[in-house]
Amino acid sequence: ILMFAHNGSLNRGCEAIVRSSSKIIKDTIPNSYVELASWRPETDKIIKDVDNFIDASPREIKPSFIEKARMFLELKLNKSEEYAQTQIHKATVDKIDDVDVCLSIGGDNYCYGEEQWLYTIDKNVKKKGKKLVLWACSIGEEDMTAKKLEDLKTFDLILARESLTHDMLKSKGLNNVKLVADPAFTMVKE
């Protein structure tokens, strides 16, 4: 299982989702192997139920002339940054091949406007024939766009952590949505 779209555990909410989710997975699925693609993996080493940490920080790309031409044409003709975003997020995209399920755990990422990098990773997950789950999300009606809705339709399962998100996504015609408690509520006090 690969958890991705995580900006590191300096944010206590992000840490809580990773810590609680990895424990839920380990407790529920014997012999599971949990990997975390993080933009700040050095902040995540404190989480004991993660088996492997991947440095998924966006990388600077130095495209060749041909790659620059490809990116330019893709942007001009298709209005897409998919090739460039795939290269920038290569560490996460390459890891998809090694797993069965990908959990997008940045539950609030869909509240920050159009996130082309996220849509690109999601497309790569589906292109590679893997299961894609949006884990413990919270999305407001005001955040919805046609592009975002198209991306959400590609998910095999969307787990909303509150009823407003659940009901709004259902009202948009998404049938892949379930209401669940925020996994952070399962954390044991240390």
Residue ranges and their predicted role:
Residues 1-141, 184, 190:
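Aromatic- and Gly/Pro-rich donor/ligand-binding loops
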Residues 144-190:
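A nucleotide-sugar donor-handling region in carbohydrate enzymes
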